[in-house]
Amino acid sequence: MEIATKAGIIGALSRRFRPFVRFMFPRIPKGHKANEHITTNLIANILGLGWAATPAGLQAMEALGELEDERGNDRSIASDEMCTFLIVNISSLQLININIIAYRSQYGSVNPTRIVGAGIVATVVSTIVGCAYCKIKNRKARR
């Protein structure tokens, strides 16, 4: 991830993800460090780099906790943003699941990448359902 960051790949992908992050997390102020950590986590997950997504995810939750402190809310109670981030993160949209391909190759699969298509479909569906659920839940909570 550090190489991708220095090469400008993460920055370029982050700009493309900004509209999605603003849509899913409208209450996070522009320029807040939580946005950067959330975006980095999403990019790492999409690229199938779960090991690289974990630190960014932990940093995102910490930044969201700090945001709750700034708002004067109890940090020990999960905010809507924390719940949304957790659901989007768990749904884990992935284009290429490097780990599954590696395991299939290691255990002698004739075509270890055959799972990629089904994996993309499954993670796209789970992410869409998760995002829709969060938007509906958050809209009802604000009424």
Regions found by a protein language model. Name each.
Residues I46-L86, S105-Y107:
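Hydrophobic transmembrane alpha-helices that form the pore/transport pathway of multi-pass ion
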Residues P19-P26, K30, E66-I77, R139-R143:
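Intrinsically disordered, low-complexity non-transmembrane regions of multi-pass membrane transporters
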Residues A34-N45, A78-V88, V110-G117:
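The feature identifies polytopic integral membrane transport proteins across all domains of life
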Residues L42, G50-W51, N89-L95, T127-I128:
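Mid-bilayer segments of alpha-helical transmembrane spans in multi-pass integral membrane proteins
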Residues A4, G8-I9, E68, Y107, ...:
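Membrane-interfacial segments
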Residues L95-Q106:
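Transmembrane alpha-helical segments of integral membrane proteins
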Residues M1-G65:
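Membrane-embedded alpha-helical segments and adjacent helix-loop junctions characteristic
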Residues R114-R143:
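Juxtamembrane and boundary regions of transmembrane helices in multi-pass small-molecule transporters
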